[in-house]
């Protein structure tokens, strides 16, 4: 498939507890997250913006597609990383040649790291109370 319909192409990305449903449609390069402009939503943070739009930069499609995202769960970092994965998957579905550009840079790798649970008898997940010999 080399083009998108008026409905667009939908893909899902996940990171930690965040889930992002990413839709790309032909347009001017605008990023919309939860019906709000993407830059203020991501608090003007360059790391979040790079994560959310990096896949478009790598494939040199920044000004050709609008990105519409519905995201929920987690924090801003998790949501930005979920958007990154969903957008990369959408671009790969758009054309197979984008996969060769995105895969070596890690855009198509799902990060499985999650918060480790707190264990009883410990203060945090791994932090133990101070040991006393006597």
Swiss-Prot record:
* Region annotated Disordered, chain positions: 105-134
Recorded hits in Pfam families, A to Z, give:
Ribosomal_S9
GO CC annotations, alphabetized: chloroplast; small ribosomal subunit
On whether Ribosomal protein is a keyword of this UniProt record, the answer is yes
**UniProt keyword list:** Chloroplast, Plastid, Ribonucleoprotein, Ribosomal protein
Which cysteine-cysteine pairs are annotated as disulfide bonds in the entry?
Answer: none
* Keyword Plastid on entry: yes
Location relative to the cell: Plastid, Chloroplast
From start to end residue, where is composition biased (Basic residues)?
115-134
What GO biological process, any one, is recorded here? translation
Record-level Gene Ontology MF annotations: RNA binding; structural constituent of ribosome
Which InterPro entries would you find in this protein's record?
Answer: Ribosomal_Su5_D2-typ_SF (IPR020568), Ribosomal_uS9 (IPR000754), Ribosomal_uS9_bac/plastid (IPR023035), Ribosomal_uS9_CS (IPR020574), Ribsml_uS5_D2-typ_fold_subgr (IPR014721)
Spell out the family assignment given in the record's similarity comment.
Answer: Belongs to the universal ribosomal protein uS9 family.
**Name the UniProt record assigns to this protein:** Small ribosomal subunit protein uS9c
The record lists the lineage as:
Eukaryota, Viridiplantae, Chlorophyta, Nephroselmidophyceae, Nephroselmidales
Q: Which gene name belongs to this protein?
A: rps9
